Amino acid sequence: MLRSSFTQSRQLLLSPARSRTAAQWLPKAGASNRLAGQRFFADAKPPVTGAPTPASPSSESPIPPESVPKPSPAAEAPPPPPPPPAPARKTGRFRKFLLYLILTSGFAYGGGIFLALKSDNFHDFFTEYVPYGEDCVLYFEERDFYRRFPNTLRNQNRAPKDEGHTVTIPSKSGLSWKVADEESGADVSQKGPHMSALDNGEKAQLKPGAAKPEEKVAAVEKAKAESAAKEQSSDDKKKVQEEPKKPAAPAVTPIEFATVSEGDEEVVQELVKTFNDIITVIGADENAHKFSGAVNKAKEELRTIGEKIIAIRNEARNAAQEEIKQAHATFDESARELIRRFEEARAHDAAQYREEFEVERERLARAYQEKVNTELQRAQEVAEQRLKNELVEQAIELNRKYLHEVKDLVEREREGRLSKLNELTANVNLLEKLTTDWKEVIDTNLKTQQLQVAVDAVRSVLERSTVPRPFVRELVAVKELAAGDPVVEAAIASINPTAYQRGIPSTSQIIERFRRVADEVRKASLLPEDAGIASHAASLVLSKVMFKKDAVAGSDDVESVLLRTEHLLEEGNLDDAAREMNTLKGWAKILSKDWLSDVRRVLEVKQALEVIETEARLQCLRVE
């Protein structure tokens, strides 16, 4: 580990990355050269050129000049340059990005397709805004349809669609507008009515399904007027341009367009459009009157074709209505047959169900009858077994009585001989019991007396001491004697630790201290709660001249409270005296606070001692 760590640190210092951070690690320019020349403890020592070779026993012997090896040119050559640094490893970020993009797109498309198949609103959003979303959803819907209906693609006996015979018109059939060469030598490549005849025909052509006969006639008349106006304007231009030529022949009446009264069929409209285009081309020629007969004949044939198409359509409609009527009749007949079969099947099923019901009812009746018979047989067997058991019990009881009588006879005979021994044993047992009970009574009385003595010791310590004296040892003795008594332990725990650690004053000390406190309270009896120095001085002076008065029952002034407290203390009633002093307020209560604390501790100790004495008396009563 040490070798690898030193080697890695040296390679890091010599690597190209170290040159970029040289300003941070090595502030001097020659630091890298010094580090390159250093040798670490874990590296092998490089061979030094020209250094003396250590002598060995074999090298010290003389070597002939012939055997001395000549220096090879390779040894004198400079050391090879260090290998180039390894190329940086490709991170493959683009491949990872492409992989994550493909996975994310796949999950997104999969989730979108799943939600689109479950929700109609999301289906509309997904198929409308997501590329290829509609194709994907359609593919999965088809798969689901084929999964639920696997026989969809089988046995497809559909009638072939009757699209009719395709009508094709050869390119060189029909009439042609070019009959002979034009004598006037007009250039047909110039712009004129003949160049826009197709446009006029397209403008005049309406939609097959929406055009009415009146609209068709109006469109034809409009096209005639436009063609005549354009022809007239072209003739005027020619006259202006060709003034030296001969005057042109008068304009020929244009050929009317072909119309079909009820040509709402698409084929008829296409045929009329083509024929009108031909008429427009012919009308643009000066020799249009030569083809008027052929055009009129073609118009008649076109009308005849339209009438035939209308007749064929009416025949097809009538045939379809007949087929529909036959289908309705067949359907009604099939429905009646289906209802009849349904009634027959229902009647057959009802009869079969009734027969099965009767068979099942008989089977259940037999099963219940067998069950009742089995229950009766078992009840009879149980009754017989019960009688047998009663007989056996009576026999056992008779045997027991016989044995008991025999035993009584034997015992009577034995009692006559061993009665004195039994009486002696009973008397000894009674004596032992009485001895044990009296021993417990004596132990309990002894413990109670010891507890009473310990309590008297505590009381004597409290009453005979002239100064407050601790009574920890006496209290510990009381607690040890009353071990396990929860009442005594609770009473001892209720005593303030300060009371038995420092002691409590006696009754005479409390009375003496009360008299000193009463003088101070009288001096401060006239002070308000927020009194200052002047108030204290005034209260001190007035307290000297105040007259003492008798205690008035129910009066709450300071003098009355002090007099009542003093009388109670003289009677030995510390509890009521403390209650009276506790009714003081203001500075009087603050001055008597310490005295009240001492009285409370004395009362707590006395109350605890009274509880312990009462518990000791109760134990004595329980023993008696």
Curated annotation (Swiss-Prot):
Ranges of the Mitochondrial intermembrane topological domain: 118-624
InterPro entries xrefs: MIC60 (IPR019133)
Location in or out of the cell: Mitochondrion inner membrane
Coiled coil location: 295-440
Biased composition (Low complexity): 46-61
Bias type Pro residues, positions: 62-87
A Pfam family matched in the record: Mitofilin
Mitochondrial matrix side: 42-96
Stretches for region Disordered: 42-89, 156-250
Superkingdom of the organism of origin: Eukaryota
Key words, A-Z: Coiled coil, Membrane, Mitochondrion, Mitochondrion inner membrane, Transit peptide, Transmembrane, Transmembrane helix
GO cellular component, one term: MICOS complex
Membrane-protein topology: Single-pass membrane protein
Described function: Component of the MICOS complex, a large protein complex of the mitochondrial inner membrane that plays crucial roles in the maintenance of crista junctions, inner membrane architecture, and formation of contact sites to the outer membrane. Plays a role in keeping cristae membranes connected to the inner boundary membrane. Also promotes protein import via the mitochondrial intermembrane space assembly (MIA) pathway.
Subunit structure: Component of the mitochondrial contact site and cristae organizing system (MICOS) complex.
Protein name listed in UniProt: MICOS complex subunit MIC60
Annotated organism of origin: Neosartorya fischeri (strain ATCC 1020 / DSM 3700 / CBS 544.65 / FGSC A1164 / JCM 1740 / NRRL 181 / WB 181)
Designated gene of the protein: MIC60
